[in-house]
């Protein structure tokens, strides 16, 4: 572990893990951690395992090399400070306790529906950093930084879902109180405490709505300086196109298909336990007696306190139906709760099933009506659906699975022995001759053949309607519409009686949908598909960040700007349907930052869905001017760098020194009398350590340790004497280099 390369939050995390004090300047934290590491190393060499906090304190102090010793040291220090600034803003996220821990602190609520309880447990955690940035008035879509592989990571952002090193609530409160006190004392020195981000208060309204959380995600990622580096695309191996397996082209993006493509599991089950995901097979059938098997091999572990259950829904569906099995026309599923589902209608059927159970799915096309039946562990459960052949027409039925928090394994007939023998005359779909099967669409051979369409427009402008209509009118392109409403559909629990969600749970579900959507966009950029990104995307920085992810795609932008009357009417309709309104502050922020995109290196084409550019530009300009008048002045972020270094650089350019704006030198008697004490003394430069000691004691109220800091600072008294004797005639140069001079050796 290289201590000097660690950032402030990482230093604090390592110290807390060892039970050591995590308050103070970065220099103190680094030395404290280095001493602990030295003590652990010495004890390991001596054969004593596990150095505790006491052993670390007994270790010999090891000085940490000061950064910025050379001519380029200041620049390197500034870069580190910039990174620490971002860390300070994200520090709330790093210290946020996991939902399970937060649930343990709260009182146990009365029994509620599973979905509501799980989401309320999640909401006990602290606010995300996106919430802190969304409320600020200065979000204007600047350049981006790596939102992480990491969006989500975070925003970024690291893309990892969890942050290590969570701490106990009591210790955290004590640490925060101590940090606040240290920051008050260390403000003049530009310490880390001064850079600590301050979270904004939550809005009084508990329920915010979809547009609010979409704006939060955009505002959070707008701090990014560059898009995250795209991961290398996995090379597709040559596959036998006659095999029946799960189709990676039509499956959900968040469904992780196994390597052999005969099974899979949800990708975000731990972060988003309410999210359903699934896939269809590559082949369907239109005649005969055909079957396949599905087994729940494992229920995925979930966070402590999460009340979500593991479920599998298995059955048949036609091509082009939605991925939610049983919730669309010509989509038929058998649910693990002992329910059958067709076109969104649920009825009781058969038995419940779960881990290690095998469900047999049978389609009989040889009767007057197509009969779909199921079995559990070899036991026949009877016919669940009867479908008119006239209504089904020539559509093929494809095996389809949909799961939540579980791992599923499928047998299409590729196994030597089935889990349970099928009824007589039924054959596995893999045994059906290839010419009698119906193949689904083949994915593009290369990612360069794929296309992404970025929707741009204010909330309620009609982007979603345009995207859905365009995808329906171009079925051969098989567009995947990525929007918050699509994700919400996959997160909702449906059944005999849909549980009524309270505003708090509904608000949390919308928040999770926006976060999940950000991760799906990153996954989409590595998939050989066509996409429509159905979000507001009013920030130029957000447009750039997303489109740069799809660098090998054909990238198009569709701007939807209706006239004012139509937009107001659509907003009212949206409010009636979705039950939420866009907060005024969020709408003003979007208007103020909305500008029409122009064709550039990451936008191959810009088109307009309603009003053309000549008509849309005056409306957008009007929105922008009105919003800027109503918005409060933007709060500029305070410069949390080392203020002393910055002030010195500014003063050196004016021929001034460390204190004040007075021009100084050996001829300035007033300056020498004022600063150095006794009148009549010729102006000189007192020992650097004496001056630093006074500042240190005044700000931190503790004794200055000379030996501790002697390796960090040079003896400027000796250096300045050398400088004076060698350059007495060059007064101007002398003034310019009061602090910048490196001395002669």
Curated annotation (Swiss-Prot):
The modification Phosphoserine is found at residues 159, 166, 183, 186, 224, 226. It comes from the Eukaryota. Residues 224-417 form the B30.2/SPRY domain. Keywords: Methylation, Nucleus, Phosphoprotein. The modification Omega-N-methylarginine is found at residues 654, 682, 736, 745. Residues 73-97, 230-239 have a biased composition (Acidic residues). GO terms for cellular component: nucleoplasm; nucleus; synapse. Binds to MLF1 and retains it in the nucleus. This is Heterogeneous nuclear ribonucleoprotein U-like protein 2.
């Amino acid at each position: 572990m290289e201590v000097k390369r660690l950032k402030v939050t990482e230093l604090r995390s390592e110290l807390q893990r060892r039970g050591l004090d995590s308050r103070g300047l970065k220099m103190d934290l680094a030395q404290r951690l280095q001493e602990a590491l030295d003590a652990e190393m010495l004890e390991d060499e001596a054969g004593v395992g596990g150095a505790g906090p006491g052993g670390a304190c007994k270790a010999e102090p090891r000085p940490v090399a000061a950064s910025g010793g050379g001519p380029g040291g200041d620049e390197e220090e500034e870069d580190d400070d910039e990174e620490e600034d971002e860390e300070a803003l994200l520090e709330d996220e790093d210290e946020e306790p996991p939902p399970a821990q937060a649930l343990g602190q709260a009182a146990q609520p009365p029994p509620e529906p599973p979905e509501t309880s799980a989401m309320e447990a999640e909401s006990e955690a602290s606010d995300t950093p996106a919430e802190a940035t969304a409320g600020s008035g200065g979000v204007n879509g600047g350049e981006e930084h790596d939102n992480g592989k990491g969006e989500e990571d975070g925003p970024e952002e690291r893309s990892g879902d969890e942050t290590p090193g969570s701490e106990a609530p009591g210790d955290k409160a004590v640490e925060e109180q101590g940090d606040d006190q240290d920051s008050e004392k260390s403000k003049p020195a530009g310490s880390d405490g001064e850079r600590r981000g301050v979270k904004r208060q939550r809005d009084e309204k508990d329920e915010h709505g979809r547009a609010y959380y979409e704006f939060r995600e955009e505002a959070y990622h707008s701090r990014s300086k560059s898009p995250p580096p795209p991961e290398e695309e996995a090379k597709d191996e040559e596959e036998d196109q006659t095999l029946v397996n799960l189709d990676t082209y039509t499956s959900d993006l968040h469904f992780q298909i196994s390597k052999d493509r005969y099974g899979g599991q949800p990708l975000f089950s731990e972060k988003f336990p309410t999210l359903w995901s699934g896939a269809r097979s590559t082949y369907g059938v239109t005649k005969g007696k055909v079957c396949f098997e599905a087994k729940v091999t494992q229920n995925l572990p979930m966070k402590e306190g999460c009340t979500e259950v593991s479920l599998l829904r298995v059955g048949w569906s036609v091509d082009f139906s939605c991925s939610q099995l049983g919730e669309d026309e010509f989509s038929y599923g058998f649910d693990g709760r002992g329910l059958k589902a067709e076109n969104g209608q649920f009825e009781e059927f058969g038995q419940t099933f779960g881990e290690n159970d095998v469900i047999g799915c049978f389609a009989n096309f040889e009767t007057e009506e197509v009969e779909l039946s199921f079995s559990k562990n070899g036991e026949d459960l009877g016919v669940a659906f009867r479908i008119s052949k006239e209504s089904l027409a020539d559509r093929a039925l494809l095996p389809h699975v949909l799961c939540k928090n579980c791992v599923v394994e499928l047998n299409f007939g590729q196994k030597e022995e089935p889990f349970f023998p099928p009824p007589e005359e039924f054959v596995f779909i893999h045994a059906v001759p290839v010419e009698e099967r119906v193949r689904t669409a083949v994915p593009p051979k290369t990612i360069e053949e794929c296309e992404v369409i970025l929707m741009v427009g204010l909330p309620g402008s009609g982007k979603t309607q345009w995207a859905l209509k365009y995808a329906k009118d171009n079925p051969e392109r098989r567009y995947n519409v990525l929007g918050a409403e699509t994700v919400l559909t996959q997160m909702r629990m449906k059944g005999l009686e849909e549980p009524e969600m309270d505003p708090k749970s509904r608000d949390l579900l919308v928040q999770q949908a926006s976060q999940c959507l950000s991760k799906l966009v990153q996954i989409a950029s590595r998939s050989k598909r066509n996409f429509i990104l159905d979000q507001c995307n009013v920030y130029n920085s957000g447009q750039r960040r997303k489109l740069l992810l799809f660098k090998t795609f054909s990238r198009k932008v569709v701007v939807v700007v209706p006239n004012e009357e139509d937009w107001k009417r659509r907003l009212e309709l949206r409010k009636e349907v979705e039950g939420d309104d866009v907060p005024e502050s969020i709408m003003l922020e979007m208007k103020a930052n909305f500008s029409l995109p122009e064709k550039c290196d990451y936008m191959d084409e810009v088109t307009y869905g309603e009003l053309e550019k000549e008509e849309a530009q005056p409306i957008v300009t009007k929105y922008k001017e009105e919003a800027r008048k109503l918005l409060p002045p933007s709060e500029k972020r305070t410069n949390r760098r080392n203020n002393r270094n910055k002030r010195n650089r500014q003063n050196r350019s004016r021929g001034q020194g460390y204190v004040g704006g007075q021009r100084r030198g050996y001829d300035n008697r007033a300056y020498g009398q004022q600063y150095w004490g006794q009148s009549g003394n010729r102006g000189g430069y007192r020992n650097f350590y004496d001056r630093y000691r006074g500042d240190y004691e005044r700000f931190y109220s503790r004794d200055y340790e000379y030996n501790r800091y002697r390796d960090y600072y040079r003896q400027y008294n000796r250096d300045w004497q050398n400088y004076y004797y060698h350059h007495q005639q060059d007064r101007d140069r002398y003034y310019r280099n009061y602090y910048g001079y490196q001395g002669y050796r």
